[in-house]
C-alpha cells in the first residue's frame, strides 16, 4: 500500500475514533463484528500502520471479524479512547498502560518476549560531535524526550538521570518531541545534544540506516523495564477474551512479530507494572495529571 493511501486510512481512522468518542450510546458490544485495535504512537503513525498490516491480516483470519488498526495522535488520546471504551485491543507502553488502567476498564494479557525476557531498557543517547558522551556532558544541554506519558522516552530517562545527580529544569532543559524516532533524529541533527528513548527502537533505527552510530552514542541504559502490554476491554465476552489470549500467546508468525521486534508474546498481569508506579513516585510525579 502506498504511503499516501496509508496516510488517508490513518486520517480516516482517527476522525472515526474521535467522532465515536464524542458519541453517547448504550455501550460497546461484548462481541462486536469489528475490533478496534490501537497501536502505540511511539513512531511515525503511517509507518506503524504500514508495518502492521500482517497483524491485521492475522487477526482478521483468527477472529473472522473486521479489524481496524488505529494510531492516535499521542499517548493521551489513546488513554482517552480507552477510557471511553472505544478500543477493543490496545498495545500500550508500560507507563501509558498504568495511566490508562487508572481510568479505564481494561486488562493486560500479553507482553512481548525478546531474547527470552519480558523486559527491555531505555537508552540515554548523546551527540558525539557535540562531545556529549557522559552524564557530566549532559549538564547545560537540551535533552530530548518523547511523549510525556512515555515509559522509556520520559519516565526512565528522567529516573536514570536523577540517579546520576541530574535534574530536569535545573541541570538540563527537557523538551518533548512526541516520539522515539523524533528524539533520535533531534540528537543526531544536533537540535538536542542528548535524549532518552527505547533501546530496541534505537537499535532498529540504526539497522534501517536512519541513525548513524558514529553520530549518536549510547551513554547509559536504564534498569530493566517490563515490556509493552497488550490489553483488552474488560467488557468483552469471556469467550472472546479467552480467544484473544490464545491467539496472541500462540502467535509465531515472523511477519506479524517483526514490527514488534519480538520472538513472541507471553502472559502478563497488572502487578507486573507495579515497578512503573513506584518509579513515578520516586520522581515525585503525579500520574493523574498525565491524563486529560
From Swiss-Prot:
InterPro entries: PhnD (IPR005770)
Keyword annotations from UniProtKB, A to Z: Cell membrane, Lipoprotein, Membrane, Palmitate, Signal
GO process terms (BP): transmembrane transport
Key word Lipoprotein present: yes
Protein's membrane topology: Lipid-anchor
Main location: membrane
Positions where lipid (S-diacylglycerol cysteine) attaches: 21
Signal peptide interval: 1-20
Gene Ontology CC: ATP-binding cassette (ABC) transporter complex
Gene3D superfamilies reported for this sequence: Periplasmic binding protein-like II (3.40.190.10)
UniProt cross-references to SUPFAM superfamilies, sorted A to Z: Periplasmic binding protein-like II
Highest taxon above the source species: Bacteria
Subcellular location: Cell membrane
Lipidation residue positions, type N-palmitoyl cysteine: 21
Subunit structure: The complex may be composed of two ATP-binding proteins (PhnC2), two transmembrane proteins (PhnE2) and a solute-binding protein (PhnD2).
Function field: Probably part of the ABC transporter complex PhnC2D2E2. Binds strongly to methylphosphonate (MPn), ethylphosphonate (EPn) and inorganic phosphite.
Family indicated by similarity: Belongs to the phosphate/phosphite/phosphonate binding protein family.
Protein name in UniProt: Probable ABC transporter phosphonate/phosphite binding protein PhnD2
Source organism: Prochlorococcus marinus (strain MIT 9301)
Gene: phnD2
Amino acid at each position: 500500500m502506498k504511503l499516501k493511501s496509508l496516510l488517508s486510512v490513518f486520517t480516516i481512522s482517527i476522525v472515526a475514533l474521535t467522532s465515536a468518542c464524542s458519541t453517547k450510546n448504550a455501550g460497546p458490544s461484548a462481541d462486536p463484528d469489528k475490533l478496534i485495535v490501537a497501536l502505540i504512537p511511539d513512531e511515525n503513525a503511517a509507518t506503524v500502520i504500514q508495518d502492521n498490516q500482517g497483524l491485521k491480516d492475522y487477526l482478521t483470519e483468527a477472529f473472522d471479524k473486521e479489524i481496524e488498526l488505529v494510531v492516535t495522535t499521542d499517548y493521551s488520546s489513546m488513554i482517552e479512547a480507552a477510557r471511553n471504551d472505544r478500543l477493543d485491543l490496545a498495545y500500550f507502553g508500560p507507563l501509558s498502560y498504568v495511566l490508562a488502567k487508572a481510568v479505564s476498564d481494561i486488562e493486560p494479557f500479553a507482553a512481548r518476549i525478546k531474547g527470552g525476557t519480558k523486559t527491555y531498557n531505555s537508552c540515554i543517547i548523546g551527540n558525539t560531535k557535540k562531545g556529549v558522551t557522559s552524564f557530566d556532558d549532559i549538564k547545560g544541554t537540551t535533552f530530548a524526550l518523547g511523549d510525556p506519558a512515555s515509559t522509556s522516552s520520559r519516565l526512565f530517562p528522567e529516573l536514570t538521570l536523577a540517579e546520576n545527580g541530574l535534574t530536569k529544569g535545573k541541570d538540563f532543559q527537557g523538551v518533548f518531541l512526541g516520539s522515539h524516532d523524533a528524539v533520535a533524529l533531534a540528537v543526531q541533527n544536533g537540535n538536542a545534544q542528548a535524549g532518552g528513548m527505547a533501546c530496541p527502537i534505537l537499535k532498529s533505527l540504526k539497522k534501517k540506516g536512519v541513525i548513524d552510530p558514529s553520530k549518536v552514542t549510547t551513554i547509559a541504559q536504564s534498569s530493566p523495564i517490563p515490556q509493552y502490554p497488550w490489553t483488552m476491554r474488560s467488557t468483552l465476552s469471556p469467550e472472546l477474551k479467552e480467544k484473544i489470549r490464545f491467539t496472541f500467546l500462540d502467535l509465531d508468525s515472523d511477519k506479524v512479530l517483526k514490527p514488534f521486534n519480538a520472538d513472541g508474546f507471553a502472559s502478563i498481569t497488572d502487578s507486573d507494572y507495579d515497578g512503573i508506579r513506584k518509579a513515578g513516585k520516586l520522581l515525585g510525579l503525579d500520574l493523574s495529571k498525565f491524563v486529560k
